């Protein structure tokens, strides 16, 4: 599943490529991709003549701020134009976007297509079809419509995410620290890859009970999380199967991982073999010598 660095890579690509993109037509190729409104025609109607004004990210969600455009000759910028709600996207396991100039026939696994007046297309492709989209009317609360958004913990790059916050959040938790990092209500956007890599960087065993981790270790863990995530974003994220950026390119962070998917290979620090075991159903990679 795309995690924070992959979603942020997509967000940056969308923001760069879709400057002043006005949706003139929407084609829903798979109804189940539209999570809200329940009527796909309402989804299509709501998005038509909307300018994609700005792309944001919250955890693993992409959020497009929309502006209402009645006249194609409207002058930019449109800061003062009427809001037209939000387009929210969760890529889930295999979803990704493609931007196509002078659109052609849809490729296999195309789920939703957005067109501008010049027939440029923003295409959403999803092999396993778990991804979802929401059009949220300007009069509605995003957090009320999408329950998962409202329950997200702080962003790893935010001031709210620090050692003091972590210490309080885990003080009574008997779960492993790996399970804690995967809990989106505690910290938003971290998944299996970056939990493993961050714990390795911090020298903390993924099996440690969260409540046993000392504050000085949490300071190091928070720093490691930020460093690992920034490094991955700089590499365009990680591609092991379906993830692509807007240009169709793979992420390169997978070539730099220290433990993730390196089972049986030598630790880059100590030479000990990397091991793998499941924690709460998720494959976990670590170095028993470097992580305590």
Curated annotation (Swiss-Prot):
GO MF annotations, alphabetized: 8-oxo-7,8-dihydroguanine DNA N-glycosylase activity; class I DNA-(apurinic or apyrimidinic site) endonuclease activity; damaged DNA binding; zinc ion binding
Coiled-coil segments on the chain, per record: none
Cofactor: binding comment: Binds 1 zinc ion per subunit.
Pfam families (UniProt xref): Fapy_DNA_glyco (PF01149), H2TH (PF06831), zf-FPG_IleRS (PF06827)
Reaction catalysed by this enzyme: Hydrolysis of DNA containing ring-opened 7-methylguanine residues, releasing 2,6-diamino-4-hydroxy-5-(N-methyl)formamidopyrimidine; 2'-deoxyribonucleotide-(2'-deoxyribose 5'-phosphate)-2'-deoxyribonucleotide-DNA = a 3'-end 2'-deoxyribonucleotide-(2,3-dehydro-2,3-deoxyribose 5'-phosphate)-DNA + a 5'-end 5'-phospho-2'-deoxyribonucleoside-DNA + H(+)
GO terms classed as biological process: base-excision repair
Keywords: DNA damage, DNA repair, DNA-binding, Glycosidase, Hydrolase, Lyase, Metal-binding, Multifunctional enzyme, Zinc, Zinc-finger
Cofactor: Zn(2+)
Keyword Zinc among record annotations: yes
The protein's Enzyme Commission number: 3.2.2.23, 4.2.99.18
Keyword Hydrolase belongs to the record: yes
Binding positions (DNA): 109, 128, 173
Zinc finger boundaries on the chain: FPG-type: 258-292
Superkingdom per UniProt: Bacteria
Active-site residues, as the UniProt record annotates them: 2 (schiff-base intermediate with dna), 3 (proton donor), 60 (proton donor), 282 (proton donor)
Chain's role: Involved in base excision repair of DNA damaged by oxidation or by mutagenic agents. Acts as a DNA glycosylase that recognizes and removes damaged bases. Has a preference for oxidized purines, such as 7,8-dihydro-8-oxoguanine (8-oxoG). Has AP (apurinic/apyrimidinic) lyase activity and introduces nicks in the DNA strand. Cleaves the DNA backbone by beta-delta elimination to generate a single-strand break at the site of the removed base with both 3'- and 5'-phosphates.
Family: Belongs to the FPG family.
Subunit structure of this chain's protein: Monomer.
Protein name: Formamidopyrimidine-DNA glycosylase
Species per Swiss-Prot/TrEMBL record: Prochlorococcus marinus (strain MIT 9301)
Taxonomic placement: Bacteria, Bacillati, Cyanobacteriota, Cyanophyceae, Synechococcales
Gene: mutM
